[in-house]
Design a protein with these regions (language model features):
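Acetyl-CoA-dependent GNAT
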Residues: 10-11, 18, 23-95, 106-108, ...
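Active-site acidic-Proline motif in GNAT/NAT acetyltransferases
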Residues: 93-95, 99, 128-129
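Conserved active-site alpha-helix within GNAT-family acetyltransferase domains
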Residues: 103-104, 128-146
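Conserved GNAT acetyl-CoA-binding A-motif
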Residues: 113-125
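Conserved catalytic-core motifs of GNAT/GCN5-like acyltransferases
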Residues: 123-125, 143-159
């Protein structure tokens, strides 16, 4: 088995769509979106998402050419300064879990953020009951910032636990 993590490109859009829709169907309680919403997306949206740009990059876990995991980094649209990014859209097929690939996704995403050099903060979070996410987040030095009550797309009411990693102090160059 030859497993690698790499940045996705526009050529990956069909595989991205297939895996993302699978994730939303099988694990609806861990995402902010739903299968019913994303299945309606036009191909052009998937192509743009897979292609990445200076506001986002998706990464894929690829096993012998097959996409088996995805994770992304996105400029935080709610942050007026443009200096913050959000990590999300993470999913790994069950067969590939508990093998260190989540850590490799963190490494790839944080490398992208640092290479961009304009970002100061990295945000991430999880549903309170998602212990695997909590462990990965804390392992990479993120600090808790808030518990936010949330109704999840699966209908469950459970806190969203927010974290932040400060890359550089405000005003530091």
């Amino acid at each position: 088995m030859s497993v690698a993590i790499r940045a996705l490109t526009v050529e990956d859009w069909r595989a991205l769509r297939e895996l993302r829709l699978h994730a939303l169907r099988t694990d609806p309680g861990v995402f902010f979106s739903t299968y019913d919403a994303e299945v309606l997306w036009p191909d052009s949206r998937w192509i743009a998402l897979a292609g990445g740009d200076d506001t986002r990059q998706l990464f894929g876990l690829v096993d012998d050419g097959r996409l088996v995991g995805i994770s992304g980094v996105f400029v935080d649209r709610d942050e007026p300064s443009g200096e913050a990014v959000v990590l999300g859209m993470s999913y790994i097929l069950p067969k590939y879990r508990r093998r260190g690939f989540a850590s490799r996704f963190y490494e790839a995403r944080l490398a992208w953020v640092r290479a961009a050099a304009r970002f100061r903060r990295v945000k991430v979070g999880h549903r309170r009951s998602n212990e695997a996410s909590r462990r990965a987040i804390e392992r990479f030095g993120f600090r808790w910032t808030a518990d936010e009550p949330r109704r999840w797309p699966d209908g469950g009411d459970e806190d969203y636990v927010a974290y932040e990693l400060l890359l550089r102090e405000p005003g530091a160059e």
